[in-house]
Amino acid sequence: MSGASARDATLLGFDYGEKRIGVAIGNALTRSARALVVIPNLNREHRFKAVGDLLAEWRPDALVVGLPMHPDGTPHEMTQQAKRFGNQLNGRFGLPVTWVDERYSSVEAEAGLRERNVRGRARAEMLDAEAARVILQQYLDQLSDHEHH
């Protein structure tokens, strides 16, 4: 069998922000995701060097990018930037990109860190990676709702 099937794919999830990009890793077979790292979004060169290093290390089969929306589902000021980031990932690294509605990911991430008693600076530093985990987990949960084609 050549390559990983969609059922056991390794995935990287991204929560794109102007200052920071949260990254999570997940597996389609186990349907689980975990926060990985936060990349400072200093400039395009730094951003893609850091992403390239992660791709070399984790060798994902596909990427998931959170798409920020307003609560009513209309585009957010960050929607276009996140979409551009996903398109650049696809163009640069040749991996398929799926977008996931990330409307409540930061709220959920904040609550998850609070539940685990992560406080202060540690919470602030982990928040973006945890938001990426929430986004990726949402995608994985959708996979089990209707098996991946």
From Swiss-Prot:
EC code: 3.1.-.-
GO biological process: rRNA 5'-end processing
Matches recorded under Pfam families: RuvX
Record keywords, A-Z: Cytoplasm, Hydrolase, Nuclease, Ribosome biogenesis
Alphabetical list of InterPro entries matching this protein: RNaseH-like_sf (IPR012337), YqgF (IPR005227), YqgF/RNaseH-like_dom (IPR006641), YqgF/RNaseH-like_dom_sf (IPR037027)
Annotated compartments: Cytoplasm
Superkingdom, taxonomy of origin: Bacteria
Primary residence: cytoplasm
Residue intervals passing through the bilayer: none
Molecular function, one GO term: nuclease activity
Keyword NADP attributed: no
Any one GO CC term of the record: cytosol
Cited NCBIfam families: RNAse_H_YqgF
Record-stated family: Belongs to the YqgF nuclease family.
Protein name in UniProt: Putative pre-16S rRNA nuclease
Organism: Burkholderia ambifaria (strain MC40-6)
